[in-house]
Amino acid sequence: MTVSKILKQIIDSQTTKNVVIGQLGLGSITKLKQLITLLAHHKDKQLTLKLFVDISDTSGILLANEELTTLLCPQGSISLTAIEGCQRVIVSNCKLTIDFYLGQYLTQLQALPMVNDGFVDGWHVTSDADQTQLRQILFWQLAKLSKNDAQFSLDDTFTEVSQLELYTQAEQVGLYRYADNIPGNIQSGDEICFQERAAMRAQSRALQAPYPICSAAVTTHATCSNLGIAIIGGGVASACLALSLAERGQQVTLFCEDHALAQAASGNKQGAIYPLLTPDNNTLSQYFQQAYLFSLQRLKSLAAQGHPIDFDLCGVVHTGHDERSRKRVAKIINGQNWQPSIARAITAEQASSIAGLKIDDGGIFYPMGGWVSPQDFTRAAFNQAKAIAGASLKLNTQITDIHYKDGGWELTSNTERFGSFKALILANGKSITQFPQTQYLQATGFRGQVSHVPSRAKLSKLSSVLCAHGYMTPSNNTLHCLGASYVKNAPNTDYCPNEQVENLHKIQHSYVGQEWVEDIDVSGHSARVGVRMVTRDHAPMMGPAPDIDSIMTLYQDHQLTPQSRKYWQSHNAPVHQGLYVLGGLGSRGLSSGPLAAESLAAQICGDLMPISRDFVALLNPNRMWMRKLLKGKALEVGVEV
């Protein structure tokens, strides 16, 4: 049988709506095209294809293949990049999701967070898979992630010897070959395999205990007693979350206190999209690269679907503004062998050519980055959620209280009550700490004033986003944006003349002596002020809302001893059931927010998230407290950690 026929029979045999197929090896573009076409035709099912691909010269070329990018998004280019980790692509009008896991097979499989028991319906191995990695320890990882009746198949181009060896290894972990017209049967020795799988899943969950992964009791059908999922917010993060939930068939209601979407931190005329990189490419840096790629995909996909979005992926030129920052920029670009599509070193001459203006410093160029209108991005994401699953929006509705009762969340405004909702997500930016349940979250508000200056003379030639001490965008509707101020716990969001001048000074300081800087005119007092919530480690907050009262109660009995460290390592940290947090996006929420939203939607619905277990820990809202508890350090609520 061909691979397509085998997988078609596996898919057809499943009674559940969600079907997951795993594959080791990328295969040829022709075969991958056949597979994607096959999966896309199953309109009655929600299909996920998980491709585990070793990073090599060959796979890098295939990932960049123009035919593949066109296949993934016929109306717009989707860029895959050979970096380790998961890159999620949503195709076929959200009925097919493809996760590209790049790197060593075993490493990628072991990094997957456990959301529920086995979820993979069938595994396939292509002839181009690295057979040196196909060892017994790998097959046990496949089994750990599989349903009990999951099937196993190989390309028919394998030699008879290789087929015999691989099928034997698969059978030893309870994965059986799919035979023509014969449904899989549980073998007599499988109970031992199933027990081993359960033990491996328990081990994985134990590793996740400090940063729990919690699904909600949601269904795809709202009822009188269950109105689905509520989101409090109104910016890019909440709109992208609504879209990710809608793609899973969820009924979503978004509560926004303003007269329209994107009136707070997401209300700027232009916002830059580019990754946050570190010299050592730490976990934060790795997350931002994957998030950046997903954000670009979301943006391009929404635009291709006809949503009006002002954006220009014209690239971002990042230079230093003094000796210290120049050394930092050099340390970043020289610290790793970055993929050229992510970041590459440029000279002063190259920077000037790219930007269209004279620049005296070299630095970093992010070729796929650029700017987007956050308001347009927000509206497009929500309108798409409304189109595919009827997401609803309640404007001018300020929620003043949230209350958990009888297995659901009830919301109260000044005039109405809403609910009950099986899940509630707080994605309300600067107000994320307004409720008792989240008042101690470690995120701080920073006021940011963005100045608007008319495009004129030499300044009008700017053709890429500039980033140094401050940032400046190419013109859109005859205006450039530059900024932004950074004022902690500011008392208001009124226009500030001093901050307007400070924004100009930042550009002057960054590009000393350049004639084009003289064309920047801030005298029109045109600006916009917002508040972005910033975490100390610069990572977003995504996950179940921590129950700090319960944590502190347990802390009284488990603190400052070796035994207490073991306790926090092995017990699930307390959370508020059905309550989730999406916030702390800081100044790069356009880059980090959409993937955080997609991951949270997956967690809520009990799906596998497109991020690693390390990323789950990085983003978890309880991480500041848990880092201290896991080290046996003292904990004090209300103090920044």
From Swiss-Prot:
Names of required cofactors: FAD
Catalytic activity, EC: 2.1.1.61, 1.5.-.-
This protein's record includes keyword Aminoacyl-tRNA synthetase: no
This protein's record includes keyword Cytoplasm: yes
Keywords annotated in UniProt: Cytoplasm, FAD, Flavoprotein, Methyltransferase, Multifunctional enzyme, Oxidoreductase, S-adenosyl-L-methionine, Transferase, tRNA processing
Annotated InterPro entries: FAD-dep_OxRdtase, FAD/NAD-bd_sf, tRNA_MAMT_biosynth_bifunc_MnmC, tRNA_S-uridine_synth_MnmC_C
Annotated stretches, region: FAD-dependent cmnm(5)s(2)U34 oxidoreductase: 232-641
Cellular component GO terms held in the UniProt record: cytoplasm
Location within or outside the cell: Cytoplasm
GO biological process, one term: methylation
SUPFAM superfamilies, per the entry: FAD/NAD(P)-binding domain
Job of this protein: Catalyzes the last two steps in the biosynthesis of 5-methylaminomethyl-2-thiouridine (mnm(5)s(2)U) at the wobble position (U34) in tRNA. Catalyzes the FAD-dependent demodification of cmnm(5)s(2)U34 to nm(5)s(2)U34, followed by the transfer of a methyl group from S-adenosyl-L-methionine to nm(5)s(2)U34, to form mnm(5)s(2)U34.
Family named by the database record: In the N-terminal section; belongs to the methyltransferase superfamily. tRNA (mnm(5)s(2)U34)-methyltransferase family. In the C-terminal section; belongs to the DAO family.
PANTHER family recorded: SARCOSINE DEHYDROGENASE-RELATED, TRNA 5-METHYLAMINOMETHYL-2-THIOURIDINE BIOSYNTHESIS BIFUNCTIONAL PROTEIN MNMC
Protein name in UniProt: tRNA 5-methylaminomethyl-2-thiouridine biosynthesis bifunctional protein MnmC
Species annotation: Shewanella pealeana (strain ATCC 700345 / ANG-SQ1)
